Each structure stands twice: as C-alpha cells, then as structure tokens.
Amino acid sequence: MKVIEVLSSSKESWEDATQNAVSQASKTVKNIKSVYVAEQSAVVDGDKVTEYRVNLRLTFEIK
C-alpha cells in the first residue's frame, strides 16, 4: 500500500471536494482503497462560505 497527500476544493461542500480529489486522482492512480480527511477549511467572503477545502491522504494498492 502507498499513501499520497492530495489537496482539493469545491464551491458546494466538503463532501464534494473529497469526491473531486478522488475523481481527479483516479485518472492517474489506480486501486484507490481509502481516503482519510486530514484537514477541512473554508474560504469566507463577507457572510458566505465561497469555497470548501480538504487536505486528504489517499491510500492505494501497488500491484
């Protein structure tokens, strides 16, 4: 197994940011087995959250 760190963001939610990271990573990394959300943050403009950010660790199997 190998672990890589991935940063991702979304205008919608932390869940969407996580899915975006997995979708993008799976284009070049095969056999992703799990994702661990290490950090969550958000960008705020005025009184609105404008961007959700996640710092993830993706675990994948090396064959």
List the model feature ranges, each with a label.
Residues 40-63:
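A cross-kingdom feature marking charged/low-complexity
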Residues 5, 36, 55-57:
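Soluble periplasmic/extracytoplasmic beta-strand elements of cell-envelope proteins
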Residues 1-34:
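Short, well-ordered alpha-helical segments
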